[in-house]
C-alpha cells in the first residue's frame, strides 16, 4: 500500500483510488465524491450498505455547493452551520438533484463537514473539492486509530494511506440536522 503525504494524493483519488487518512478523531476512508465506481469500491471495502449514505468533508463550504441545495435552507440555518465550522460538527443538508445515490443513500440529504483538521483540509485543498469520508473500519467494528491498524485491516483493499496525525477529538463529530436543528449524534 502506498504511503503518501496529502499533497501527493490528487491524481490517485481523481483516478478512482480509495485512501485512508487521519481525521479529527479516527482514521477515515475516502474517495472522489464524483466517481461512483470509487464510492462503490469504498462501500465494498467497508462492507457498508449504500442506503446509509456517506459524509463529505471539505476545507471550506464553497467546496460543498455542488452537492448541497442551499435554496432549501434559510439564512439562519446556514449561519448556524457556518458558526460551527471549521470544526467537529457535521450537518445534514438537502441535496441537489444530481447527487449520486451512493453518496446520500436513501435520503434526500447529505452529511457535510468543514473540517478544522489540518490534514483533512490539505487533502481537500489538494483535490480542489470535498472528499468522501467514513470511518476506517468494517461495518460494526471499531474505527482505526493508527496507521498500523490501517495497514493490517486494509492492505490490498485500498490504494493508499495518507500520512499524518489524528486530531485531538476523542469522539466522532456531532451530527446536526440543518433544517430542524435536531442533534442526531452527540459526538462531544
Curated annotation (Swiss-Prot):
This protein's record includes keyword Chaperone: no
YrdC-like domain span: 3-188
GO cellular component, one term: cytoplasm
Pfam family, one: Sua5_yciO_yrdC
Localization in the cell: Cytoplasm
PROSITE patterns, per database record: YRDC
Primary location recorded for the protein, binned into one broad class: cytoplasm
GO biological process, one term: regulation of translational fidelity
The protein's Enzyme Commission number: 2.7.7.87
Tree of life domain: Bacteria
Keywords associated with the record: ATP-binding, Cytoplasm, Nucleotide-binding, Nucleotidyltransferase, Transferase, tRNA processing
Keyword Calcium assigned: no
Catalysed transformations (reactions): L-threonine + hydrogencarbonate + ATP = L-threonylcarbamoyladenylate + diphosphate + H2O
Broad EC category: transferase
Reported function: Required for the formation of a threonylcarbamoyl group on adenosine at position 37 (t(6)A37) in tRNAs that read codons beginning with adenine. Catalyzes the conversion of L-threonine, HCO(3)(-)/CO(2) and ATP to give threonylcarbamoyl-AMP (TC-AMP) as the acyladenylate intermediate, with the release of diphosphate.
Protein name listed in UniProt: Threonylcarbamoyl-AMP synthase
Organism listed in the record: Shewanella sp. (strain ANA-3)
Amino acid at each position: 500500500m502506498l504511503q503518501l503525504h496529502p499533497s501527493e494524493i490528487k491524481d490517485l483519488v481523481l483516478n478512482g483510488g480509495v485512501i485512508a487518512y487521519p481525521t479529527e478523531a479516527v482514521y477515515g476512508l475516502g474517495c472522489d465524491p464524483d466517481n461512483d465506481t470509487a464510492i462503490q469500491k469504498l462501500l465494498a471495502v467497508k462492507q457498508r450498505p449504500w442506503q446509509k449514505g456517506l459524509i463529505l468533508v471539505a476545507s471550506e463550504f464553497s467546496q460543498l455547493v455542488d452537492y448541497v441545495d442551499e435554496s432549501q435552507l434559510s439564512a439562519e440555518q446556514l449561519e448556524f452551520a457556518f458558526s460551527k465550522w471549521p470544526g467537529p460538527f457535521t450537518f445534514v443538508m438537502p441535496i441537489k438533484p444530481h447527487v449520486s445515490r451512493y453518496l446520500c443513500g436513501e435520503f434526500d440529504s447529505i452529511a457535510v463537514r468543514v473540517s478544522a483538521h489540518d490534514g483533512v483540509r490539505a487533502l481537500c485543498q489538494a483535490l480542489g473539492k470535498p472528499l468522501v469520508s467514513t470511518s476506517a473500519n468494517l461495518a460494526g467494528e471499531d474505527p482505526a486509530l493508527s496507521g498500523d491498524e490501517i495497514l493490517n485491516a486494509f492492505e490490498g483493499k485500498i490504494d493508499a494511506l495518507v500520512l499524518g496525525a489524528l486530531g485531538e477529538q476523542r469522539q466522532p463529530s456531532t451530527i446536526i440536522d440543518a433544517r430542524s436543528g435536531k442533534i442526531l449524534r452527540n459526538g462531544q
